[in-house]
Amino acid sequence: MKIGIPKEIKNNENRVGLSPSGVHALVEQGHTVLVEKDAGLGSFFEDKDYKDAGADIVSEQSSVWDVEMVIKVKEPLEEEYKYFKEGLILFTYLHLANEEKLTQALVDNKVVGIAYETVQLPDRSLPLLTPMSEVAGRMSAQVGSQFLQKFNGGMGILLGGVPGVPKGKVSIIGGGQAGTNAAKIALGLGANVTILDVNPKRLAELDDLFDGRVNTIMSNPLNIENAVKESDLVIGAVLIPGAKAPSLVTEDMIKQMKDGSVIVDIAIDQGGIFETTDKITTHDDPTYVKHGVVHYAVANMPGAVPRTSTIALNNATLPYAQLLASKGYREAFKANHALSLGLNTYKGHVTHKGVAEAFGLEYTSVEDALKED
């Protein structure tokens, strides 16, 4: 199979779809890999590293898209839509429930859109989302602490406190991979940490995991309101695979927070859980202030630590990329049901229910869509 690795063009997106080791693995299987010139520089991979791994380096962006499968990190931007074509396999994070234009472009051009974030194992875990959830979760506590500093617009709080001064209060809404990793870092910084989740079993697991060092609370509107208004830092880490994130924190709740407190919305790429995160920010300009509260709403948080993120992502995605390249998508879906759940668009159909519901589009099951070929 002929595979393309474009250079990411999203603001400060320094990750790359495959590392040189991933390219080497595919070339060893007999596939041809085209890598756009300088695609790996943001992750400190040189063109020579890719060439030594067996890739062909191409200067024209159009050439790297003129392939059978494109492997990326983030969803294509509008200037890349012109490269879409019928039957192209697009393997990347798509987050379509918050991307109506992209969804329509994929449908109109009959692209086979496979989203990392909806590949799901029988135990309901998300193997291609997990590594980036771990990174974003850990980063959320770090950046939250950073923006609590006075010169960054915060109230000037040290999360760990000092003797005689209370610790900062951190509330994390969502106890999945991102929320758990946020709690690990927040605890490491010495904060007073509360996790809210709708699943009592998960709260019990978190209580055991952290040896009772975090407060675990059932997530409901009243508990969220009480936690939010008392917190110095609130981290939103709720995920519904493939669907738009639920709006859990209202504007009235935000108004009750102290001036200079901070919210970090990890779920912003799926629409966000805070009513006041009404715009996506970038690493160049990551925050804005609303009702006195610093809002951090960067959709590609792991792009700030690209070396770690690229290697972690490559470790997870490579086996699926190898399967797609070696068998083609039809046989790959038959061989791996988890991968078939990643199919969001297929030759004019929307094949993920959450995406279809987000925009009032007709939903076609993966099985039915494949039958129409």
Swiss-Prot record:
Recorded catalytic activity of this chain's protein: L-alanine + NAD(+) + H2O = pyruvate + NH4(+) + NADH + H(+)
SUPFAM superfamilies linked to this entry: Formate/glycerate dehydrogenase catalytic domain-like, NAD(P)-binding Rossmann-fold domains
Active site: H95 (proton donor/acceptor), D269 (proton donor/acceptor)
Signal peptide: none
Record: residues binding substrate: R15, K74
BP GO terms, sorted: alanine catabolic process; L-alanine catabolic process
Pathway: Amino-acid degradation; L-alanine degradation via dehydrogenase pathway; NH(3) and pyruvate from L-alanine: step 1/1
CDD domains from the UniProt entry: L-AlaDH (cd05305)
One Pfam family this sequence matches: AlaDh_PNT_N
Similarity-based family: Belongs to the AlaDH/PNT family.
Function of the molecule: Catalyzes the reversible reductive amination of pyruvate to L-alanine. May play a role in cell wall synthesis as L-alanine is an important constituent of the peptidoglycan layer.
Protein name: Alanine dehydrogenase
Organism field: Staphylococcus haemolyticus (strain JCSC1435)
Gene, per the UniProt record: ald
